Regions:
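Short loop/turn segments immediately following the C-termini of beta-strands
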Residues: 45, 90-92, 142-146, 188-191, ...
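Surface loop/turn motifs at the tips and blade-to-blade linkers of beta-strand repeat domains
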Residues: 21-27, 62-70, 116-125, 164-169, ...
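Repeated scaffold domains used in trafficking and secretory/extracellular systems
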Residues: 27-34, 69-77, 122-132, 169-177, ...
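Structural motif
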Residues: 48-51, 94-103, 147-152, 192-202, ...
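Loop/turn-rich, solvent-exposed surfaces of beta-rich toroidal or solenoidal domains
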Residues: 168-205
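Blade-loop segments of beta-propeller domains
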Residues: 57-92
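Short coil/turn segments that connect the beta-strands within blades of beta-propeller domains
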Residues: 37-38, 82-83, 135-137, 180-182, ...
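Beta-strand-rich domains and repeat architectures in extracellular enzymes and scaffolds
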Residues: 21-46, 74
Length: 289
C-alpha cells in the first residue's frame, strides 16, 4: 500500500461533491492510509510503510509495537500531520479490542515517539478509524465493535475531550478522515459474498453538538470484489480521495480468511480527487495473477 508523507504546510482542505475512479495500484498493508505533500503512508496490521509519489518504498517499520507502553498486536487506521503519523493501535483478538492507544511515529523514519492514553470511561471498546482534526488540534477515533460514537482527544494535552453520537450508525466502520469539520467514514457494510458494494458516509461535526447526522457520501460500486474497504484520506497536494480496499480477500470478523476464486493476495488502495466537478478516484488493490 502507498501514500505520501511530508512536513510542508498546505492550505485547508475541503471535500468535493463528486468523485470518479481514476487509477488503481497495489500496495503492502491493508489497514490505513495517509498522505502529505511528498509521501504516502500505509499501515498493515503489524507494519508501517512509507512510499514516495512514484510508488517506491522509502521506509518500513516492521516492529511498530516496540517500546509501546501497552502490549499491542494490531494497527488500524492512520493519519499524518506536522511530520508525525498518528496510528490507532490495540490488542485485537476474535473481533474484540483491548489496550487502545494512539501511537505517534516520526513520519521521517517511522520510529515510535510517544502514545496518547485511551480513556476507558469514554465507553470506547475498540479502535478502527483515526483522524486528525487539523482545525481544532484534536485526534478522533472510531469503534468497529460499537460504532455509535466518535471519540475526540486534545492533541496538546492528550486528554479525552468528548464523544459524538452518530445517527444513524454506519455498520462495520473502518476508516475516518476529517476535513473542514466534516468527517468522512468508510464502512464495510456490503456483503462481499453477494457482491454488495461498501460505502462512504459523511457527518458534520462543526456545530459542536453531542450528536451528528450521518449521510451517504459515495457508494463504492466501482471497486470489484472489494472484500472490505478500509482506511481513507485526502491527498493535500492533489485533492485525491484515497480509499484502501482488500480486493479479493474474504474477511470474517476483521480477519482475512482466504480469498475469493481467482485471487491469491489482498492489500490494495484507491483514491479520489476532489477538485471541482471533475474530481477523480484513485484506488490501490491487490490484483489476481
Amino acid at each position: 500500500m502507498l501514500l505520501l508523507a511530508a512536513g510542508t504546510a498546505l492550505r485547508a482542505q475541503t471535500l468535493g461533491g463528486e468523485y470518479r475512479l481514476s487509477r488503481v495500484f497495489p500496495v503492502e498493508g491493508r489497514q490505513g492510509i495517509a498522505a502529505d505533500s511528498n509521501y504516502y503512508y500505509v499501515s498493515g496490521s503489524t507494519v508501517l510503510y512509507k512510499y514516495d509519489k512514484q510508488g517506491r518504498l522509502v521506509a518500513r517499520n516492521g516492529q511498530p509495537f516496540e517500546g509501546l507502553p501497552l502490549a499491542a498486536n494490531h494497527i488500524g487506521d492512520i493519519d499524518v500531520w506536522n511530520g508525525e503519523i498518528y496510528a490507532g493501535i490495540e490488542t485485537f483478538e476474535d473481533g474484540k479490542g483491548e489496550n487502545i492507544q494512539v501511537a505517534v511515529y516520526d513520519a521521517d523514519d517511522l520510529t515510535w515517539k510517544r502514545s496518547i492514553d485511551w480513556e476507558p470511561a469514554s465507553g470506547q471498546v475498540e479502535v478502527c478509524g483515526l483522524a486528525v482534526d487539523r482545525d481544532r488540534n484534536m485526534v478522533w477515533m472510531a469503534d468497529w465493535v460499537d460504532g455509535r460514537y466518535l471519540y475526540g482527544y486534545d492533541l496538546a494535552t492528550g486528554k479525552y475531550v468528548r464523544k459524538v453520537h452518530l445517527r444513524p450508525v454506519p455498520q462495520w466502520q473502518q476508516g475516518i478522515y476529517m476535513a473542514g469539520g466534516q468527517m468522512l467514514i468508510s464502512a464495510d457494510d456490503g456483503d462481499a459474498d453477494l457482491d454488495e458494494p461498501d460505502n462512504l458516509y459523511i457527518a458534520d461535526l462543526r456545530d459542536g453538538k453531542s450528536y451528528a447526522t450521518v449521510l451517504p457520501f459515495r457508494m463504492m460500486s466501482d471497486f470489484r470484489r472489494a472484500g472490505e474497504i478500509e482506511g481513507l484520506t485526502v491527498d493535500p497536494a492533489t485533492d485525491e480521495l484515497l480509499v484502501l480496499s482488500n480486493r479479493g480477500s474474504r474477511i470474517v470478523l476483521g480477519v482475512v480468511r482466504g480469498f475469493y476464486q481467482g485471487y491469491d493476495r489482498c492489500w490494495e488502495w484507491s483514491g479520489v480527487s476532489t477538485r471541482g466537478t471533475t474530481a477523480n478516484c484513485t484506488k490501490c488493490m491487490s490484483m489476481k495473477r
